[in-house]
Protein backbone atom coordinates (compact mmCIF):
# COMPACT_ATOMS: atom_id res chain seq x y z
CA UNK A 1 0.00 0.00 0.00
CA UNK A 2 2.73 2.47 0.95
CA UNK A 3 4.45 1.92 -2.41
CA UNK A 4 1.33 2.32 -4.54
CA UNK A 5 -0.85 4.85 -2.70
CA UNK A 6 -0.53 8.48 -3.76
CA UNK A 7 -1.76 10.65 -0.89
CA UNK A 8 0.58 11.66 1.95
CA UNK A 9 -2.05 10.58 4.47
CA UNK A 10 -1.59 6.94 3.54
CA UNK A 11 1.83 6.97 1.92
CA UNK A 12 3.63 8.97 4.64
CA UNK A 13 1.38 9.09 7.69
CA UNK A 14 0.29 5.46 7.32
CA UNK A 15 -3.37 6.14 8.07
CA UNK A 16 -4.54 2.74 6.84
CA UNK A 17 -5.18 -0.54 8.60
CA UNK A 18 -5.10 -4.06 7.07
CA UNK A 19 -6.53 -7.29 8.40
CA UNK A 20 -7.25 -10.92 7.59
CA UNK A 21 -10.30 -12.49 9.23
CA UNK A 22 -11.83 -15.92 9.39
CA UNK A 23 -15.01 -16.57 7.44
CA UNK A 24 -17.12 -15.44 10.42
CA UNK A 25 -15.41 -12.04 10.27
CA UNK A 26 -13.15 -12.27 13.35
CA UNK A 27 -9.76 -10.67 12.75
CA UNK A 28 -6.95 -13.21 13.05
CA UNK A 29 -4.07 -10.91 12.12
CA UNK A 30 -4.12 -7.17 11.61
CA UNK A 31 -3.86 -3.82 13.34
CA UNK A 32 -7.25 -2.30 14.03
CA UNK A 33 -9.59 -5.10 14.95
CA UNK A 34 -12.31 -6.41 12.68
CA UNK A 35 -14.83 -4.08 11.11
CA UNK A 36 -16.39 -7.01 9.23
CA UNK A 37 -18.77 -8.03 12.02
CA UNK A 38 -20.53 -4.65 12.21
CA UNK A 39 -20.58 -4.53 8.41
CA UNK A 40 -22.19 -7.97 8.11
CA UNK A 41 -24.87 -7.00 10.63
CA UNK A 42 -26.02 -4.24 8.27
CA UNK A 43 -25.37 -5.86 4.86
CA UNK A 44 -28.28 -7.65 3.20
CA UNK A 45 -27.00 -8.40 -0.32
CA UNK A 46 -25.43 -11.63 -1.55
CA UNK A 47 -21.65 -12.10 -1.46
CA UNK A 48 -20.04 -13.91 -4.37
CA UNK A 49 -16.55 -14.75 -5.53
CA UNK A 50 -14.87 -11.74 -7.12
CA UNK A 51 -16.99 -9.21 -5.24
CA UNK A 52 -15.21 -6.29 -3.60
CA UNK A 53 -17.27 -4.10 -1.31
CA UNK A 54 -16.68 -0.42 -0.58
CA UNK A 55 -18.25 1.74 2.12
CA UNK A 56 -17.51 4.79 4.23
CA UNK A 57 -20.82 5.53 5.97
CA UNK A 58 -20.86 4.89 9.73
CA UNK A 59 -24.64 4.96 9.86
CA UNK A 60 -24.94 2.28 7.16
CA UNK A 61 -22.48 -0.23 8.63
CA UNK A 62 -23.02 -0.02 12.41
CA UNK A 63 -19.98 2.25 12.82
CA UNK A 64 -17.55 -0.23 11.27
CA UNK A 65 -15.90 3.07 10.35
CA UNK A 66 -16.46 6.24 12.32
CA UNK A 67 -16.27 9.10 9.82
CA UNK A 68 -16.68 9.54 6.08
CA UNK A 69 -13.03 10.11 5.02
CA UNK A 70 -12.22 6.50 6.03
CA UNK A 71 -12.99 4.29 3.02
CA UNK A 72 -13.27 0.57 3.74
CA UNK A 73 -12.56 -2.18 1.21
CA UNK A 74 -13.75 -5.70 2.04
CA UNK A 75 -12.88 -8.80 0.01
CA UNK A 76 -14.47 -12.20 0.64
CA UNK A 77 -11.87 -14.92 0.06
CA UNK A 78 -13.05 -17.91 -1.95
CA UNK A 79 -11.37 -21.19 -2.79
CA UNK A 80 -13.01 -23.62 -5.20
CA UNK A 81 -16.27 -21.74 -4.85
CA UNK A 82 -16.26 -21.86 -1.02
CA UNK A 83 -15.96 -18.82 1.22
CA UNK A 84 -12.94 -19.42 3.50
CA UNK A 85 -11.88 -16.02 4.88
CA UNK A 86 -11.96 -12.23 4.55
CA UNK A 87 -9.36 -9.63 3.78
CA UNK A 88 -10.09 -5.98 4.44
CA UNK A 89 -8.46 -2.61 4.80
CA UNK A 90 -9.46 0.96 5.35
CA UNK A 91 -7.59 4.10 4.44
CA UNK A 92 -8.15 7.76 5.19
CA UNK A 93 -8.81 9.68 1.98
CA UNK A 94 -7.44 13.20 1.61
CA UNK A 95 -10.84 14.53 0.59
CA UNK A 96 -14.37 13.19 0.64
CA UNK A 97 -16.20 16.24 -0.68
CA UNK A 98 -18.40 18.27 1.61
CA UNK A 99 -18.21 21.88 2.69
CA UNK A 100 -14.43 22.22 3.26
CA UNK A 101 -11.26 20.72 1.77
CA UNK A 102 -10.19 17.70 3.78
CA UNK A 103 -13.83 16.95 4.65
CA UNK A 104 -13.51 17.54 8.40
CA UNK A 105 -15.55 20.73 8.93
CA UNK A 106 -15.78 21.80 12.56
CA UNK A 107 -18.91 23.81 11.76
CA UNK A 108 -20.85 20.86 10.31
CA UNK A 109 -24.12 20.10 12.08
CA UNK A 110 -25.17 17.04 10.04
CA UNK A 111 -23.33 14.31 8.17
CA UNK A 112 -24.77 15.66 4.90
CA UNK A 113 -22.28 18.53 5.10
CA UNK A 114 -19.28 16.22 5.40
CA UNK A 115 -19.13 14.74 1.92
CA UNK A 116 -20.27 11.82 -0.15
CA UNK A 117 -21.77 8.88 1.73
CA UNK A 118 -21.08 5.45 0.26
CA UNK A 119 -23.36 2.71 1.60
CA UNK A 120 -21.97 -0.84 1.46
CA UNK A 121 -21.68 -1.18 -2.31
CA UNK A 122 -20.06 -3.65 -4.67
CA UNK A 123 -17.18 -1.81 -6.31
CA UNK A 124 -16.42 -5.06 -8.13
CA UNK A 125 -19.09 -7.61 -9.06
CA UNK A 126 -17.71 -11.09 -9.75
CA UNK A 127 -14.34 -9.55 -10.55
CA UNK A 128 -15.65 -6.75 -12.80
CA UNK A 129 -15.03 -3.14 -11.80
CA UNK A 130 -18.20 -1.06 -11.71
CA UNK A 131 -16.53 1.89 -13.40
CA UNK A 132 -19.64 4.07 -13.53
CA UNK A 133 -19.97 3.81 -9.76
CA UNK A 134 -16.31 4.66 -9.24
CA UNK A 135 -16.51 7.71 -11.50
CA UNK A 136 -19.63 8.93 -9.71
CA UNK A 137 -17.82 8.72 -6.37
CA UNK A 138 -14.64 10.40 -7.63
CA UNK A 139 -16.68 13.16 -9.27
CA UNK A 140 -17.72 14.28 -5.78
CA UNK A 141 -14.27 14.71 -4.20
CA UNK A 142 -11.64 17.43 -4.59
CA UNK A 143 -8.71 15.02 -5.00
CA UNK A 144 -10.00 12.43 -7.49
CA UNK A 145 -6.54 11.36 -8.64
CA UNK A 146 -5.27 10.74 -5.12
CA UNK A 147 -8.45 8.94 -4.13
CA UNK A 148 -8.36 6.75 -7.24
CA UNK A 149 -4.78 5.64 -6.63
CA UNK A 150 -5.33 5.18 -2.90
CA UNK A 151 -8.44 3.09 -3.51
CA UNK A 152 -6.58 0.99 -6.08
CA UNK A 153 -3.83 0.45 -3.50
CA UNK A 154 -6.35 -0.75 -0.91
CA UNK A 155 -7.95 -3.12 -3.42
CA UNK A 156 -4.57 -4.49 -4.51
CA UNK A 157 -3.53 -5.06 -0.90
CA UNK A 158 -6.75 -6.91 -0.09
CA UNK A 159 -6.43 -9.03 -3.22
CA UNK A 160 -2.85 -9.92 -2.27
CA UNK A 161 -3.97 -10.96 1.21
CA UNK A 162 -6.77 -13.05 -0.30
CA UNK A 163 -4.30 -14.73 -2.64
CA UNK A 164 -2.02 -15.62 0.28
CA UNK A 165 -4.95 -17.15 2.19
CA UNK A 166 -5.79 -19.34 -0.78
CA UNK A 167 -2.14 -20.36 -1.14
CA UNK A 168 -2.06 -21.43 2.52
CA UNK A 169 -5.25 -23.42 2.04
CA UNK A 170 -3.88 -25.14 -1.06
CA UNK A 171 -0.58 -25.94 0.65
CA UNK A 172 -1.90 -27.16 4.02
CA UNK A 173 -5.59 -27.83 3.46
CA UNK A 174 -8.72 -26.07 4.68
CA UNK A 175 -8.82 -27.92 7.99
CA UNK A 176 -5.32 -26.81 8.93
CA UNK A 177 -6.03 -23.22 7.89
CA UNK A 178 -9.25 -23.05 9.90
CA UNK A 179 -7.82 -24.76 12.97
CA UNK A 180 -4.76 -22.49 12.91
CA UNK A 181 -7.01 -19.44 12.86
CA UNK A 182 -9.01 -20.87 15.77
CA UNK A 183 -5.83 -21.53 17.75
CA UNK A 184 -4.58 -17.98 17.20
CA UNK A 185 -7.92 -16.59 18.38
CA UNK A 186 -7.92 -18.91 21.40
CA UNK A 187 -4.40 -17.89 22.42
CA UNK A 188 -5.48 -14.27 22.44
CA UNK A 189 -8.55 -15.18 24.49
CA UNK A 190 -6.44 -16.99 27.09
CA UNK A 191 -3.93 -14.14 27.31
CA UNK A 192 -6.59 -11.46 27.72
CA UNK A 193 -8.46 -13.53 30.32
CA UNK A 194 -5.29 -13.48 32.41
CA UNK A 195 -4.74 -9.75 31.84
CA UNK A 196 -8.34 -8.92 32.77
CA UNK A 197 -7.98 -10.90 35.99
CA UNK A 198 -4.78 -9.03 36.82
CA UNK A 199 -5.78 -5.44 36.12
CA UNK A 200 -9.57 -5.09 36.36
CA UNK A 201 -11.11 -5.29 39.84
CA UNK A 202 -14.57 -6.44 40.77
CA UNK A 203 -15.32 -3.14 42.48
CA UNK A 204 -16.22 -0.38 39.99
CA UNK A 205 -13.75 2.30 39.03
CA UNK A 206 -15.02 5.56 37.56
CA UNK A 207 -13.24 8.20 35.54
CA UNK A 208 -14.39 11.12 33.44
CA UNK A 209 -12.63 13.58 31.20
CA UNK A 210 -13.70 16.35 28.88
CA UNK A 211 -13.46 17.78 25.40
CA UNK A 212 -12.99 21.40 26.37
CA UNK A 213 -14.43 22.93 23.22
CA UNK A 214 -15.70 21.83 19.82
CA UNK A 215 -14.25 24.75 17.89
CA UNK A 216 -17.68 26.37 17.67
CA UNK A 217 -17.72 27.77 21.18
CA UNK A 218 -19.68 24.91 22.71
CA UNK A 219 -18.49 22.58 25.43
CA UNK A 220 -17.09 21.13 27.53
CA UNK A 221 -18.31 17.63 26.67
CA UNK A 222 -17.96 14.93 29.30
CA UNK A 223 -16.89 11.36 28.56
CA UNK A 224 -17.55 9.16 31.57
CA UNK A 225 -16.78 5.46 31.94
CA UNK A 226 -17.24 2.96 34.75
CA UNK A 227 -15.11 -0.20 34.65
CA UNK A 228 -15.45 -3.40 36.67
CA UNK A 229 -15.16 -7.17 36.38
CA UNK A 230 -17.82 -9.85 36.67
CA UNK A 231 -16.13 -13.24 36.80
CA UNK A 232 -13.88 -13.40 33.75
CA UNK A 233 -15.63 -10.57 31.91
CA UNK A 234 -14.61 -6.90 31.86
CA UNK A 235 -17.45 -4.37 31.81
CA UNK A 236 -17.16 -0.81 30.47
CA UNK A 237 -20.23 1.39 30.92
CA UNK A 238 -20.30 4.89 29.41
CA UNK A 239 -23.48 5.96 31.20
CA UNK A 240 -23.12 9.58 32.28
CA UNK A 241 -21.43 10.66 29.05
CA UNK A 242 -22.86 13.94 27.75
CA UNK A 243 -25.53 14.05 25.04
CA UNK A 244 -24.40 14.28 21.43
CA UNK A 245 -22.91 17.53 20.18
CA UNK A 246 -24.49 19.82 17.63
CA UNK A 247 -21.11 20.04 15.90
CA UNK A 248 -18.85 17.38 14.36
CA UNK A 249 -16.97 16.16 17.46
CA UNK A 250 -19.36 13.23 17.93
CA UNK A 251 -17.69 9.82 17.84
CA UNK A 252 -19.98 6.97 16.73
CA UNK A 253 -18.17 4.30 18.74
CA UNK A 254 -18.99 0.72 17.83
CA UNK A 255 -18.73 -1.58 20.83
CA UNK A 256 -16.29 -3.89 19.05
CA UNK A 257 -14.07 -0.91 18.24
CA UNK A 258 -13.76 -0.07 21.92
CA UNK A 259 -12.94 -3.71 22.65
CA UNK A 260 -10.11 -3.33 20.14
CA UNK A 261 -8.90 -0.16 21.91
CA UNK A 262 -8.88 -1.98 25.25
CA UNK A 263 -7.14 -5.06 23.88
CA UNK A 264 -4.44 -3.27 21.92
CA UNK A 265 -3.80 -0.89 24.82
CA UNK A 266 -3.31 -3.62 27.41
CA UNK A 267 -1.47 -6.09 25.18
CA UNK A 268 1.05 -3.48 24.03
CA UNK A 269 1.77 -2.56 27.65
CA UNK A 270 1.69 -5.97 29.34
CA UNK A 271 3.08 -8.28 26.65
CA UNK A 272 3.71 -6.88 23.15
CA UNK A 273 4.71 -10.37 21.97
CA UNK A 274 1.08 -11.49 22.08
CA UNK A 275 -0.51 -11.56 18.62
CA UNK A 276 -3.37 -9.07 18.76
CA UNK A 277 -6.67 -10.26 17.27
CA UNK A 278 -10.39 -10.51 18.00
CA UNK A 279 -10.20 -13.70 20.04
CA UNK A 280 -10.89 -11.99 23.38
CA UNK A 281 -14.03 -10.04 22.41
CA UNK A 282 -16.39 -12.36 24.32
CA UNK A 283 -14.54 -11.37 27.50
CA UNK A 284 -15.55 -7.71 27.23
CA UNK A 285 -18.97 -6.09 27.56
CA UNK A 286 -19.29 -2.48 26.38
CA UNK A 287 -22.35 -0.36 27.12
CA UNK A 288 -22.83 2.96 25.31
CA UNK A 289 -26.10 4.87 25.75
CA UNK A 290 -27.86 5.99 22.57
CA UNK A 291 -27.98 9.71 21.87
CA UNK A 292 -24.71 10.49 23.60
CA UNK A 293 -21.45 11.91 22.28
CA UNK A 294 -20.27 8.32 21.66
CA UNK A 295 -23.45 7.02 20.02
CA UNK A 296 -25.17 9.97 18.35
CA UNK A 297 -28.47 9.74 16.56
CA UNK A 298 -28.55 10.04 12.78
CA UNK A 299 -27.80 12.39 11.05
CA UNK A 300 -25.35 13.89 13.55
CA UNK A 301 -22.05 15.17 12.15
CA UNK A 302 -19.07 12.87 12.79
CA UNK A 303 -16.06 14.18 10.89
CA UNK A 304 -14.20 15.66 13.89
CA UNK A 305 -14.42 12.48 15.93
CA UNK A 306 -10.62 12.23 16.32
CA UNK A 307 -10.67 14.46 19.40
CA UNK A 308 -13.17 12.27 21.24
CA UNK A 309 -11.27 9.17 20.11
CA UNK A 310 -8.11 10.45 21.73
CA UNK A 311 -9.94 11.41 24.91
CA UNK A 312 -11.30 7.86 25.17
CA UNK A 313 -7.71 6.60 25.33
CA UNK A 314 -7.08 9.09 28.13
CA UNK A 315 -10.11 7.77 30.03
CA UNK A 316 -9.10 4.15 29.43
CA UNK A 317 -5.53 4.83 30.54
CA UNK A 318 -6.76 6.48 33.71
CA UNK A 319 -9.07 3.59 34.59
CA UNK A 320 -6.36 0.99 34.10
CA UNK A 321 -3.70 3.11 35.74
CA UNK A 322 -5.66 3.48 38.98
CA UNK A 323 -4.72 -0.01 40.07
CA UNK A 324 -1.39 -0.50 38.35
CA UNK A 325 0.35 2.84 37.71
CA UNK A 326 3.71 1.07 37.41
CA UNK A 327 2.41 -1.08 34.53
CA UNK A 328 -0.23 0.89 32.68
CA UNK A 329 0.38 4.04 30.70
CA UNK A 330 -1.83 6.59 32.44
CA UNK A 331 -0.60 9.94 31.09
CA UNK A 332 -2.95 11.82 28.80
CA UNK A 333 -1.68 13.34 25.59
CA UNK A 334 -3.04 12.00 22.32
CA UNK A 335 -6.33 13.88 22.55
CA UNK A 336 -4.52 17.20 22.78
CA UNK A 337 -2.78 16.83 19.44
CA UNK A 338 -3.65 19.50 16.86
CA UNK A 339 -5.05 18.52 13.47
CA UNK A 340 -4.21 21.02 10.75
CA UNK A 341 -5.16 21.00 7.07
CA UNK A 342 -3.48 23.16 4.46
CA UNK A 343 -4.62 23.33 0.86
CA UNK A 344 -4.49 25.65 -2.10
CA UNK A 345 -3.82 25.89 -5.81
CA UNK A 346 -0.56 25.50 -7.68
CA UNK A 347 0.43 26.92 -11.05
CA UNK A 348 -1.43 24.25 -13.02
CA UNK A 349 -4.97 25.31 -13.96
CA UNK A 350 -7.54 23.85 -11.61
CA UNK A 351 -4.98 22.03 -9.44
Regions from the PLM with identified roles:
Residues 1-49, 54-79, 83-351:
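Glycine/proline-enriched, intrinsically flexible loops and inter-domain linkers
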Amino acid sequence: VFRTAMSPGIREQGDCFPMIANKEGKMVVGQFGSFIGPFLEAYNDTIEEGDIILTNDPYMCNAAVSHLPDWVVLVPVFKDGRHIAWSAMFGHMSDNGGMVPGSIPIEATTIFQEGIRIPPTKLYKKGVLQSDLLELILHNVRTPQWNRFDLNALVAACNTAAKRCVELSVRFGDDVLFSTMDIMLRRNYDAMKHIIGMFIPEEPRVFEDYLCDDGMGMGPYKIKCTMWREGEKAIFDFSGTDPQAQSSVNFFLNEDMFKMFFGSFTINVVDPQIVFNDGFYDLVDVRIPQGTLLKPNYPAALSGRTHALGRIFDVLGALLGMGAPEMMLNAAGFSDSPHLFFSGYDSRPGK
